[in-house]
Each structure stands twice: as structure tokens, then as C-alpha cells.
Amino acid sequence: MERSPTLYTERLILRPLELADAEAIQQHFPHWEVVRYLNALVPWPYPADGALAYLRDIALPTIARGEEWHWSIRLKSAPEQLIGNVSLMNEPDNNRGFWLSPQWQGQGLMSEASAAVTQYWFETLDRSLLRVPKAAPNLASRRLSERTGMRLIHCDEGDFVGGRFPRELWEITREEWRRLR
């Protein structure tokens, strides 16, 4: 499959992940405030080679198979610095995920990144439905879903790095997304 394009927003560059990003991911990812609401499959404590293993063994092979699309998040004002990651996944009930280094949170950057990849999901990949699971206590992620017109469709329990929490499933259809643009 064709390599994912670099995406641009007002303040961000979303560049497809590559093996060379491992060092920066290893520096910014393994922080409790980043990982606590992620799926329990994320190892914690995060191993010293966790980012390299993740890129080499999981992310890059799924990109090559056309099953997932992963981008590093970078500021246009500092394009050499990776500050987070946003991904699209071709999985049932799990189509978008992200993390952002703590010092960059609360500035609307993830809203920009999510908007760009959601547009890619609906317009380029021609998908009709986007579903996003999350730990219910992750209020910032919930607010992003609410602001972008997603609907809460299901609640159950899930295992996360920080433990067992109520889990929410949010969705938006392509038609709903287009009406809100």
C-alpha cells in the first residue's frame, strides 16, 4: 500500500512514523500522565527498548500491510521535535488513538491532529464510521469526542495501564462528520 502522506494543520506537521522516531518516542511516551488511560496491552513500566520494539514489531508492519496509519505529531515551529503520536486503526470499535507529551497538552494541539486524521479516515480511506474507545476517567479525551460531534454509544469495563475502569465507546458517521464541518 502507498505510504501515508504527511498531513498539515494550522500549527502541526503529522509525519508518518519511521524507525528513526524511536528515540524521541522513548523520551516522551513513558510518563504516567501519558499512559495511564491507554490499553493494558501497553507494557508498564515501559521497557528501555519499548519504542524501538513497538515501531519495529507492531506499528511499521501494520502500516506496511495497510491495516494502520501512524503519524508523529510535530510543531511547525519546531519540526525536528516529536511531541506525540496519532493513529488510525482498521480494528472493530477502535479506529483512532493518540498520545501527547504532557508539556504540550491543553493547547488544542490534539484537536488539530485528530481533525486531520479524521478527515483522512473519511475522505481518503473512504470509511463510513469512526469509533473510538476510551477510559471514562480520561476527561480530556472525552471532551475532544464531544467537541467533534461524536456520540457515546456504549459503556462497559476495560483494562487500562492504570487499572480497570469504565470504558466508553464513541462514534461518528461520515455523514454526521460532514454536516459538522
Enumerate the language-model features and the residues they cover.
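Soluble sensory domains of the PAS superfamily and closely related sensory modules
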Residues: 62-66
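A generic secondary-structure signal
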Residues: 57-61, 120
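Acyl-donor (CoA/ACP) binding surface of acyl/acetyltransferases
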Residues: 1-37, 70-181
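Conserved GNAT-fold acetyl-CoA-binding loop/helix
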Residues: 35-57, 71
